[in-house]
Regions:
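Polar, glycosylation-prone regions of secreted, cell-surface, and some intracellular proteins
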Residues: 30, 34, 46-48, 57-59, ...
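Short, solvent-exposed secondary-structure boundary motifs
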Residues: 12, 30-38, 101-109, 131-135, ...
Length: 336
C-alpha cells in the first residue's frame, strides 16, 4: 500500500515565483510517456520553487507499479538544480531506472518550458524544436499557455510519432495529494446509445440570460437555467465571475477560465488529448471528453464561453452521452 507524506502544508510556505506564468502551489500535470515499452504515465506536482513531487506509473502483464518521489532543488539562472530526493512510496530495484529518468527529465522540462502568448486565440500556442535523446534526438515540443508547470502539451520524437502527451491537469488544493500520487489511467467501460431522436418533437426557443436555446419537447426544464433530456443530456446556462488575477500572473481571463474548465478532480477526469478550444478570448467554444470515475463512462462536454462587459463569462454548458452525441451530433450542436 502506498504511503503519502503530507508535504503540502509546509511546502506552500516556501518561495513561489511560478505565478507569473500561471502555475500555483498544488498544480500538477500528468503525461502518457510513449518512450517506454510498457504503458507508462509520469506526473509532476509543483509545491514551490524548492519542492516538486513526481511519480512514474507503469503497467505490465506481471504487475502495475507506481513510484512516487519528492525532489528538492533551487533555481539558478533560470534552471532547476536538484539538490535532493525522497522516495515516498514502496520501491524495488527494478524501479531505480524510473527514478533516475524522472530526476533527469524534470530539470530538462523546466529549462525548456515556454509560455506562449494568446493573441487573438483563446490561449497561446508555440512549437519549439530541441535535441532530446530521451525521445530519439530531434524533437518538436508543443506548448499551450493554460497548461501549468512547463506549459507542455506534447513532444513529438524524431520518428514523427508522439513521445509524450498531456493526459490530465489539476490541483491537489481541496482534492488531497492522493488525486496526484494515487493516479490511475481512465478505463472506460463499454456504453451504448439510448437516445432516440424524435423528428416530430415540438420545437421551442427559450431565452436564458440573453442566450437562445433551441430545444424541443424531448427536454424537461428542471430550473430557470437548466434542462434535462432524459438520461442522455444536461444543458445549463450560468455566469462565472473569475477571481482577480494574482499579482504578476500573465495569463489572460480566457486562459485562466480554460485552466479551470479543463482541470480534473477526484470524481471526473478531463481527457485532454481530445480537448479542442476554438474562437477568440472573448467568445470561444471548449469541446471535451470527460470520464466519470465512478461509472467509468465518457461524456461529451461542450461549453460556449462568452465574456461580458463586466468581465464575467456567460457559459452555456452541454453534457451528453458520448455515444448519443456521435449518433446525433448535428442535433446537439444546434441547441445553442
Amino acid at each position: 500500500m502506498m504511503t503519502f507524506i503530507p508535504v503540502f502544508l509546509f511546502a506552500a510556505q516556501k518561495p513561489v515565483t511560478e505565478a507569473a506564468q500561471g502555475t500555483f502551489s498544488g498544480d500538477y500535470v500528468i503525461y502518457r510517456d510513449y518512450s517506454w515499452k510498457a504503458p507508462t504515465w509520469i506526473g509532476f506536482l509543483y509545491y514551490n520553487d524548492e519542492t516538486y513531487g513526481a511519480f512514474i506509473h507503469t503497467q505490465t502483464p506481471e504487475k502495475t507499479s507506481t513510484v512516487s518521489i519528492l525532489f528538492s532543488g533551487k533555481i539558478e539562472k533560470g534552471q532547476l538544480v536538484l539538490t535532493g530526493q525522497q522516495i515516498i512510496s514502496s520501491i524495488t530495484p527494478d524501479d531505480t531506472f524510473g527514478v533516475n529518468y524522472l530526476m533527469s527529465l524534470l530539470p530538462k522540462l523546466y529549462e525548456l518550458k515556454t509560455l506562449p502568448r494568446a493573441g487573438k486565440a483563446p490561449f497561446g500556442t508555440a512549437t519549439v524544436r530541441k535535441q532530446m535523446e530521451e525521445f530519439g534526438g530531434a524533437a518538436a515540443l508543443d506548448f499551450q499557455s493554460f497548461i501549468p508547470l512547463f506549459h507542455l502539451k506534447t513532444i513529438t520524437g524524431a520518428n514523427k510519432e508522439t513521445a509524450l502527451e498531456l493526459i490530465e491537469i489539476g490541483s491537489i488544493n481541496g482534492n488531497g495529494e492522493s488525486v496526484f500520487y494515487g493516479y490511475s489511467p481512465a478505463e472506460p467501460k463499454q456504453d451504448e446509445n439510448t437516445f432516440s431522436f424524435d423528428k416530430t418533437a415540438k420545437k421551442e426557443t427559450i431565452n436564458v440570460s440573453g442566450i437562445s436555446l433551441h430545444l424541443d419537447s424531448q427536454w424537461t426544464k428542471i430550473a430557470d437555467n437548466s434542462f434535462l433530456c432524459g438520461n442522455t443530456a444536461f444543458l445549463t446556462v450560468s455566469t462565472v465571475n473569475l477571481p482577480p488575477a494574482e499579482s504578476g500572473n500573465q495569463l489572460s481571463a480566457s486562459e485562466r477560465l480554460i485552466r479551470l474548465l479543463t482541470a480534473s478532480s477526484p470524481y471526473v477526469k478531463t481527457l485532454l488529448p481530445y480537448t479542442i478550444a476554438e474562437g477568440t478570448p472573448s467568445a470561444f467554444t471548449l469541446t471535451q471528453s470527460v470520464y466519470d470515475i465512478e461509472s467509468k463512462k465518457i461524456s461529451k462536454d461542450i461549453k460556449r464561453c462568452i465574456k461580458n462587459k463586466d468581465g464575467s463569462f456567460t457559459i452555456i454548458s452541454l453534457t451528453v452521452n458520448s455515444y448519443a452525441y456521435s449518433a446525433a451530433q448535428a442535433y446537439f450542436n444546434g441547441l445553442f
